[in-house]
C-alpha cells in the first residue's frame, strides 16, 4: 500500500497516534448536557422541515472519530447507524461505547470515504463533520457522499471556515516554517509559541471558543495537522454543486445574515438584504469573522424544493409553525439561547409566549390579538409583525420551522 493511499497516508497515520476528539467514557452522562448538532432527535425539523421525526432512519457517519456514531446510535435507538473511519483506535473506542451501552443498531467499518461505494448502501442522513477538508480531494469525497444519498435524504456537513481560522492558519504557517511535526518536542514548542502571542493576535479570539485545546491531540489536530484547508461561503456552495447536489441551507444561520432584530433600521443591513442570497452570506461572513466552521445541509437535485425551502418573503410564511431549537426558550420576560439570554420587547415577548410547536404564525398572531397585548394594530398588522419577527428568530437560530403539510 502506497503512502498516498487513504488507509496509509499522513492523515491516517496522524489519527492512529493522536486520538481525536477526546474519547467519551459514558454516553448517558455526556448526553445530559451535550448533543450532536446534526442529531435528528434534536434537529429533524432543520434537516426535514416538512415532516415529523422519523425514528427508523438509515444514518451514515462518514468519518466518525471516537464518539459521534455511538452518540447517534444512543439517541436514535430505532435508527440503523453505519460508521466509517480510517482510524482503528477511534473505531476501537466506538466499539467500547457500543458494547457498554448495548448499541445493536451501530455498525462499524474501517474504511475511507474514498471507498464508500464498496458498502453498496444508501442512506436517509449522511453526516460528515470535520473530514472533507482533510481529504486529498474533497470534491471526490463529496461525490462519494452524494452517491449514497436517497432522494429525500440530507447530507449534513462541516467544513473549516476561512476567516474564523485566520489565526490558526497564521500559526500553522509559522510551525511549518520551523519544521515542526507531531512529536512531543514540536508540541512543546507550539504551546510556548501560543503562550507568547500578543493580545491583539487573530488567534486570541479563536482560543476563547476552542475549549478542547488543552489536550495534545486537539493541538495537533488544530495546528500541526498533516493536511487541511479552509473554505469561504462560496467555496462551500461550490463543493456541494460540484457533487451534483443542491445547497439546502446553513445549520447555524446567525453568522450569515444581517440581524434587524438588534438593529431594526439599519440602512447597511437593508442594502445587504437586497443582494442575491449567496452574495449576502459572503458579505456577512467577512463581517462576522469569529465563525471558524461552516455547518450546512445539502440534498439531491430531484428532492422537491417545497420539502425544504424556507421563505419568509410572502404571506404563505404565516402558515409556518415555529419551534424552539434545542436549549432555546422563554423564561419569565427573558428569551435564552445556549450560553446567553436577553430581554425581548413586550411586543416580541407576547409572540414568543404563544410558541408551542403546534401553532402557525397566523394562529400565534390571532392569540396575541385576543389577549390585547401589545395594544394597537389590526390583525393584519400583527401577522406582518409576527412574520418578520419569526424570520429574525429563524436567522438567529432561536427557532426552527415546520412547513405546512403538502396537499
From Swiss-Prot:
Gene3D superfamilies: Vaccinia Virus protein VP39. One of its GO terms (cellular component) is peptidoglycan-based cell wall. SUPFAM superfamilies: S-adenosyl-L-methionine-dependent methyltransferases (SSF53335). GO terms for molecular function: methyltransferase activity. This is Uncharacterized protein Rv2067c. The lineage of its organism: Bacteria, Bacillati, Actinomycetota, Actinomycetes, Mycobacteriales.
Amino acid at each position: 500500500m502506497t503512502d498516498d493511499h487513504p488507509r496509509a497516508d499522513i492523515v491516517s497515520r496522524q489519527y492512529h497516534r493522536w486520538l481525536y476528539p477526546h474519547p467519551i467514557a459514558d454516553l448517558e452522562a455526556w448526553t445530559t448536557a451535550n448533543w450532536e448538532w446534526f442529531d435528528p432527535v434534536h434537529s429533524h425539523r432543520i434537516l426535514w422541515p416538512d415532516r415529523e421525526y422519523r425514528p427508523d432512519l438509515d444514518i451514515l457517519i462518514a468519518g466518525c472519530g471516537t464518539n459521534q456514531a455511538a452518540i447517534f446510535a444512543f439517541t436514535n435507538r430505532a435508527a440503523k447507524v453505519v460508521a466509517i473511519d480510517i482510524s482503528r483506535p477511534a473505531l476501537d473506542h466506538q466499539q467500547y461505547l457500543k458494547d457498554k451501552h448495548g448499541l445493536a443498531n451501530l455498525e462499524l467499518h474501517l474504511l475511507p470515504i474514498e471507498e464508500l461505494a464498496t458498502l453498496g448502501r444508501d442512506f436517509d442522513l449522511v453526516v460528515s463533520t470535520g473530514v472533507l477538508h482533510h481529504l486529498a480531494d474533497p470534491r471526490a469525497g463529496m461525490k462519494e457522499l452524494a452517491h449514497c444519498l436517497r432522494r429525500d435524504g440530507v447530507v449534513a456537513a462541516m467544513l473549516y471556515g476561512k476567516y474564523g481560522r485566520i489565526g490558526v492558519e497564521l500559526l500553522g504557517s509559522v510551525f511549518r516554517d520551523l519544521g515542526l511535526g507531531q512529536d512531543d518536542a514540536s508540541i512543546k514548542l507550539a504551546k510556548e509559541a501560543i503562550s507568547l502571542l500578543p493580545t491583539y493576535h487573530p488567534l486570541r479570539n479563536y482560543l476563547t471558543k476552542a475549549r478542547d485545546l488543552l489536550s495534545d491531540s486537539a493541538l495537533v489536530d488544530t495546528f500541526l495537522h498533516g493536511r487541511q484547508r479552509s473554505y469561504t461561503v462560496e467555496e462551500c456552495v461550490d463543493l456541494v454543486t460540484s457533487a451534483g447536489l443542491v445547497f439546502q441551507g446553513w445549520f447555524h444561520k446567525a453568522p450569515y445574515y444581517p440581524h434587524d432584530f438588534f438593529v431594526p433600521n439599519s440602512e447597511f443591513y437593508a442594502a445587504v438584504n437586497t443582494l442575491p442570497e449567496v452574495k449576502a452570506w459572503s458579505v456577512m461572513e467577512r463581517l462576522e469573522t469569529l465563525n471558524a466552521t461552516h455547518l450546512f445541509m445539502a440534498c439531491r437535485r430531484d428532492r422537491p424544493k417545497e420539502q425544504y425551502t424556507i421563505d419568509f418573503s410572502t404571506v404563505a410564511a404565516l402558515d409556518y409553525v415555529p419551534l424552539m431549537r434545542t436549549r432555546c426558550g422563554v423564561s419569565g420576560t427573558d428569551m435564552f439561547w445556549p450560553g446567553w439570554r436577553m430581554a425581548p420587547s413586550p411586543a416580541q415577548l407576547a409572540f414568543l409566549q404563544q410558541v408551542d410547536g403546534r401553532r402557525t404564525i397566523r394562529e400565534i398572531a390571532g392569540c396575541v390579538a385576543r389577549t390585547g397585548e401589545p395594544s394597537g394594530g389590526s390583525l393584519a398588522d400583527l401577522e406582518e409583525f409576527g412574520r418578520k419577527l419569526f424570520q429574525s428568530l429563524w436567522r438567529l437560530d432561536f427557532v426552527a420551522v415546520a412547513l405546512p403539510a403538502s396537499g
